[in-house]
A protein has these predicted regions:
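C-terminal low-complexity, glycine/proline- and small-hydrophobic-enriched intrinsically disordered tails
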Residues: 191, 300-314
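Aromatic/acidic polysaccharide-binding cleft in carbohydrate-active enzymes
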Residues: 297
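Structured secondary-structure scaffolds
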Residues: 1-212, 220-264, 271-285
């Protein structure tokens, strides 16, 4: 478990969480793996008077009684990366998709799940379960407390989606969410991104009403391409909150408020507007997949899904 992270086989770049991980390994304690709950893997142990049998299949003969307990949830979950791919059979999926490329759990299950996946995968396959792990924080209530049934402060995401749309909820959770840090859920923030979704829709309506005329204006193209490079770099370095916020400010404060206003009555802007819109949809798609896909489907000559289009920056 230590060697997998120390060697870099599992890249855990957040130093604070690396220290937490190693501290736990250096201070291991016994783990009771049996649980008295309704669902789970049955413990493969049978008893008959003073006899005890452990095996994959039930023992032969009469009078055997299987242990009534099940394995701890985290014991079973630790097998996830390979058990879902057909293990213990040597399947094509297991060969192709294991180890997983990237894992992003919350910090509260770093020991419960991440460390135990590394343990189980190493024991059973001699492999790491994933190549990189980035730890994220928790979504808390507006006052900073954990969501809790006893506090009755939970938020039903389906209600938020019904009220504001899935894209607005996604943006409300992404912007401001520094990786590894907790965020406070604020419904007003989600509401604000519903207004942004409306703005994106109106931007598209205006651009699609224009003819694709004129030459692409070099200055505006270079400005947008510079933004696209910044957004791409942010995403590659897991600063997704910064990437989303930059797109928000550009589309609303620059493209809609300035460039579109300047272009009104000027057909020579046509190709430039289409260039910016098309590539903005590509950049925004990971954050707001539904509205961007819908707009893309309305654009002339677009047959493939937006999600399989080439990224603007190679």
């Amino acid at each position: 478990m230590r060697a997998a992270v120390e060697s870099g086989a599992v890249d855990m770049p957040q130093e604070g969480f690396r220290k937490t991980y190693f501290h736990w390994i250096e201070n291991l304690y016994d783990w009771c793996i049996s649980r008295q709950i309704w669902f789970g893997h049955r413990i493969p142990v049978w008893y008959r008077e003073q006899e005890v049998y452990c095996g994959v299949t039930p023992p032969e003969g009469d009078g055997w009684e299987q242990d009534p307990d099940v394995l701890d949830t985290w014991f079973s979950s630790a097998l996830w990366t390979f058990s879902t791919l057909g293990w213990p059979e040597d399947t094509k999926d297991l060969e192709t998709f294991h180890p997983t490329s990237f894992m992003s759990p919350a910090y509260e299950i770093l020991q419960l799940w991440v460390s135990r996946m590394i343990l189980m995968s190493g024991f059973h396959l001699g492999q790491v379960p994933f190549k990189k792990v980035m730890i994220h924080g928790l979504v808390r209530a507006k006052d900073g407390r954990k969501f809790s049934k006893s506090l009755n402060n939970g938020v039903d995401p389906l209600e938020m989606i019904e009220k504001y749309g899935a894209d607005a909820l996604r943006m409300g959770l992404i912007v401001g969410a520094v990786i590894g840090s907790d965020i406070r859920f604020d419904e007003q923030k989600v509401k604000a991104y519903k207004l942004f979704a409306n703005k994106v829709w109106n931007i598209a309506r205006f651009v699609l009403s224009q003819e694709r005329t004129g030459d692409i204006k070099t200055e505006l193209k270079e400005e947008f391409d510079a933004l696209a490079k910044e957004v791409t770099a942010d995403m590659e370095n897991y600063r997704v909150y910064m990437a989303a916020e930059k797109l928000y400010h550009y589309l609303w404060g620059r493209f809609a408020a300035e460039i579109l206003e300047e272009s009104k009555g000027k057909p020579e802007y046509g190709k430039t507007l289409y260039y910016i819109l098309e590539n903005s949809l590509k950049l925004l798609h990971p954050f707001m997949p539904f509205i961007t896909e819908e707009i893309w489907n309305s654009m002339p000559g677009k047959k493939e899904l937006l999600m399989v289009e080439e990224w603007p920056i190679k």
